[in-house]
Amino acid sequence: MFKFNEEKGQLKCSFCGKTQEQVRKLVAGPGVYICDECIELCNEIVEEELGTEEEVELKNVPKPHEIRATLNDYVIGQEKAKKSLSVAMYNHYKRINAGGRADDVELSKSNIVMIGPTGSGKTLLAQTMARILNVPFAIADATSLTEAGYVGEDVENILLKLIQAADYDVEKAEKGIIYIDEIDKIARKSENPSITRDVSGEGVQQALLKILEGTVASVPPQGGRKHPHQEFIQIDTTNILFIVGGAFDGIDQSIKRRLGKKVIGFGNDSENRNLTQKEILAAALPEDLQKFGLIPEFIGRLPVMATLEPLDEEALVQILTKPKNALVKQYKKMLQLDDVELDFTEDALVEIAKLAIERKTGARGLRSIIEETMLDIMFEIPSREDIAKVIITAETLTGKRGPTLELKDGTIEHGKEKETA
């Protein structure tokens, strides 16, 4: 109930008791009044409480063992990479909590470079890490970036994607994760500095240096090129975790040559020749990235190196079935919504893995293979209420025969043999 000064006939603030003459403004509510001073005080209390909640949330950074355990739920294999990423992520957010310093020691950022073939899980690892901490996440493609003043995207547009992922909450975006894919495509054409302008190679690496290390960047709110008369969003990149990744095709040869030099003169270098692709990539060093075409200053901003091995047939079969969001589980759930059961035989799963290896697409190509196989049956199922179960076999994958159907009356329709041209 609002207060009324009987002597002067003036309204009072229901919270602090000040009259309308003692404050700048009184806001009326149903039976109450509140002054501008009390409104300001309430705002401060709310902001302080929200700030405390956010601080508590960031301080509950999971330990490396916990991070790796969650990564295991979504990513098959790549144990060494998962361990490296878990430690880097833990150290990065521990550094944020310490304000970038521990006593008189300044703590450097733990930006990450991931080396691995297409479809080995680089993007999935980065996405899962962001999901673990519930921080904004953005993916950018390095091939679309060019130096300022040339046709293409400015590096600041990467930051805009992160700001958009944080619903334009800049403070939240400043603690997010950015994954830059295809980073190997901006390697300069040779190890020696070029006299001519390389607008999508060394020039982009130079442009990325500042935001990787930490700077206050000016980002155009609508993207595109900067114009002198537009307003900019200011974002501090000091606490943004940058992860870059690429296939780095051919880097294994550079590593082999380096390893080969160590055994020259000792008689037998057969050990070097017999190294597996996994062992070769695991031996990668910053100097190999420099030989590939990344400039030393750029490599220096990426202190954590994680190598991912090519996925073999067994790993691809596990990827199809084991993770929480495995593709086979997704398609089973999709058909379940039409009251139809879906089953992939063991040989069908192996065939899917073989096709992905043949196409050199790794895990990335698994979905398109299943989609091609399932297209006809997913087209038919909504119109056929008699189907109870669909069985996909290896012959279905190779295109020799259609899927086997179990009908609700108990009869079985074997997939028709397809004619070969």
From Swiss-Prot:
ATP-dependent specificity component of the Clp protease. It directs the protease to specific substrates. Can perform chaperone functions in the absence of ClpP. Residues 1-54 form the ClpX-type ZB domain. This is ATP-dependent Clp protease ATP-binding subunit ClpX. InterPro entries: AAA+_ATPase, ATP-dep_Clp_protease_ClpX, ATPase_AAA_core, Clp_ATPase_C, Clp_protease_ATP-bd_su_ClpX, ClpX_bact, P-loop_NTPase, Znf_CppX_C4. Zn(2+) binds at residues 13, 16, 35, 38. SUPFAM superfamilies: Glucocorticoid receptor-like (DNA-binding domain), P-loop containing nucleoside triphosphate hydrolases. The lineage of its organism: Bacteria, Bacillati, Bacillota, Bacilli, Bacillales. Keywords: ATP-binding, Chaperone, Metal-binding, Nucleotide-binding, Zinc. The keyword Chaperone applies. Component of the ClpX-ClpP complex. Forms a hexameric ring that, in the presence of ATP, binds to fourteen ClpP subunits assembled into a disk-like structure with a central cavity, resembling the structure of eukaryotic proteasomes. ATP binds at residues 117-124. Signal peptide: none annotated. Belongs to the ClpX chaperone family. GO terms for cellular component: HslUV protease complex. GO terms for molecular function: ATP binding; ATP hydrolysis activity; ATP-dependent protein folding chaperone; protein dimerization activity; unfolded protein binding; zinc ion binding. GO terms for biological process: cell division; proteolysis involved in protein catabolic process.
